[in-house]
């Protein structure tokens, strides 16, 4: 007689389901910690996290690192989208004030009639509706850094008051009796030609010299195109997390198109284009197919780029 049998080593179905659940949970935890790690890198904004290896950028970062150890006023100049706020945060985070507030004020976005109270605060009862006192941005930034974005858009009436603050290091809240002493480092930015504004008498020359103790000029992206590959790699890694993608890089033909373009929107426009491409790309590498048409030479003239404004992606002004 012959006996035939079957030996089964199958695990119970519930045990397999439990194992799959643990694997999924581990993947979710891994994604969470990766995202939190990237947030910490972005928030720290140290000089090591400013992307690029061009000689121009290295020279700027050398100046920034030296000046981060001082308390002198800094004026950062550059086109929209060149990363002026990123530089300002890096200077603050590498200074002795790194554990104190970094307070941002956009001088272009606050109405003229509200700018004084926003900067210097007000006392209870100083005007109709002032039911309680409110500290201004300068007082909130005491001990730290105040970042005056788009200083070229500050009204002349406020420029003289800011000049006094820089000279005396004290503020006068609206409705207050006595001035309040402050200890604040001022970092200002602009994308405007302040020298021309001084000639046109729309910007005070004495304020300009108070702000421009340390002047930092950020180049446009078209002036440091050798940094584009590093920036693209950085944005792909960053956006893989945001978009839940696993794109490995960009093709040579696509990268060549990016390096030929003039980048009126600078780094913010580059990030915008990479994010757009990654939303549609289902391959491992971003090819030129996924780039907007205005980056590509026209058929009639292979050296001319289609700059029809209707084809250009909108992008927010970024500092």
Where are these regions (language model features)?
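Sensory-domain boundary capping and coupling elements
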Residues: 1, 7-10
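Flexible nucleotide-interacting loop at or near the entrance of a catalytic core
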Residues: 14-73, 77
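Nucleotide-binding/hydrolysis machinery
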Residues: 55, 97-100, 175-185, 192-303, ...
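Conserved post-Walker A coupling segment in P-loop NTPases
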Residues: 62-129, 139-155, 220-225, 273
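Conserved helical "switch/dimer-interface" subregion of ABC/ABC-like ATPase nucleotide-binding domains
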Residues: 63, 122, 161, 165, ...
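AAA+/SF3 P-loop NTPase mechanochemical coupling elements
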Residues: 103, 133-143, 147, 155-161, ...
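Short gly/ser/thr-rich secondary-structure transition/capping motifs
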Residues: 125-132, 168-173, 196
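Bacterial C-terminal helix-turn-helix
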Residues: 306-319
């Amino acid at each position: 007689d012959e006996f035939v049998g079957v030996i089964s080593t199958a695990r119970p179905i519930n045990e397999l389901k439990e194992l799959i659940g643990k694997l999924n949970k581990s993947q979710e935890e891994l994604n969470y910690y990766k995202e939190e790690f990237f947030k910490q890198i972005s928030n720290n904004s140290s000089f090591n996290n400013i992307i690029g290896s061009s000689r121009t950028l290295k020279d700027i970062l050398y100046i920034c690192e030296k000046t981060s150890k001082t308390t002198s006023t800094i004026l950062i100049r550059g086109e929209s989208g060149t990363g002026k706020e990123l530089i300002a945060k890096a200077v603050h985070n590498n200074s002795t004030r790194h554990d104190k507030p970094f307070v941002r004020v956009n001088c272009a976005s606050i109405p003229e009639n509200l700018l004084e109270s926003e900067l210097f605060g007000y006392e209870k009862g100083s005007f109709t509706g002032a039911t309680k006192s409110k500290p201004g941005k300068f007082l909130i930034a005491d001990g730290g850094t105040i970042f005056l974005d788009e200083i070229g858009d500050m009204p002349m009436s406020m420029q003289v008051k800011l000049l006094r603050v820089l000279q005396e290091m004290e503020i006068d809240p609206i409705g207050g009796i006595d001035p309040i002493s402050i200890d604040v480092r001022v970092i200002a930015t602009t994308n405007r030609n302040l020298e021309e504004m001084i000639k046109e008498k729309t910007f005070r020359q004495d304020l300009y010299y108070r702000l421009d103790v340390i002047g930092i000029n950020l180049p446009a992206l078209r002036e440091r195109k050798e940094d584009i590959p590093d920036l693209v790699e950085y944005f792909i890694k960053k956006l893989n997390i945001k978009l839940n993608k696993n794109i490995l890089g960009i093709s040579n033909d696509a990268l060549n198109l990016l390096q030929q373009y003039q980048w009126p929107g600078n780094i913010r426009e580059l990030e915008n284009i990479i994010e757009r491409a990654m939303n549609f790309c289902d391959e491992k590498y971003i090819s030129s197919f996924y780039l907007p048409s205005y980056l590509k030479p026209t058929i009639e003239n292979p050296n001319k780029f289609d700059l029809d404004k209707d084809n250009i992606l909108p992008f927010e002004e970024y500092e």
